[in-house]
């Protein structure tokens, strides 16, 4: 009866987190269910991550073009938003490196699969370059991977 009248687990429904842990393990991402937090959607997830990882005045990267909501959300938190050019060939690596050197952003919010709004997937060689630069400049990637299961081989 407590379940009906009480609040649920703040981290989210445990069986869901356990299932997510198994699915992530299938793609070699080890994440214990107790280290996970589920949200009601990507909007609240991005806002929660930005609040936890950034302070007002920090720089955050987004794809250019990007989903319009992200920019407004980040700016409301006092964050400086910088767009990184992206097209069917992937992220502009030279521009990304220049931005990382100049601004030292905390986060890069992106979709590598079925990017919104372009629907392009990042090519593997481009993904590896992005990952290399993120590691080199200590910038975290926030991957909005909502469309992953809409393409074959996933």
Role assignments for model-derived ranges:
Residues 144:
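Glycine-centered flexible beta-alpha turn that most often forms the glycine-rich phosphate-binding loop
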Residues 3-138, 148-153:
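Conserved core of the PLP fold type I
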């Amino acid at each position: 009866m407590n379940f009906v009248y009480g609040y649920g687990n703040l981290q989210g429904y445990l069986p869901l987190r356990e299932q997510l842990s198994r699915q992530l393990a299938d793609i070699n991402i080890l994440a214990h269910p107790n280290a996970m937090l589920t949200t009601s959607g990507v909007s609240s997830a991005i806002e929660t991550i930005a609040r936890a990882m950034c302070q007002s005045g920090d720089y955050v990267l987004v794809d250019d073009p990007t989903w319009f909501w992200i920019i407004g959300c980040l700016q409301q938190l006092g964050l400086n938003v910088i767009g990184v050019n992206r097209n069917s060939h992937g992220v502009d690596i030279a521009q990304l490196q220049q931005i990382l050197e100049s601004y030292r952003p905390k986060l890069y919010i992106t979709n590598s699969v079925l990017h919104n709004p372009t629907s392009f997937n990042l090519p593997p060689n481009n993904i590896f370059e992005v990952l290399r630069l993120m590691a080199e400049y200590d910038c975290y990637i926030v991957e909005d991977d909502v469309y992953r299961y809409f393409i074959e081989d996933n």
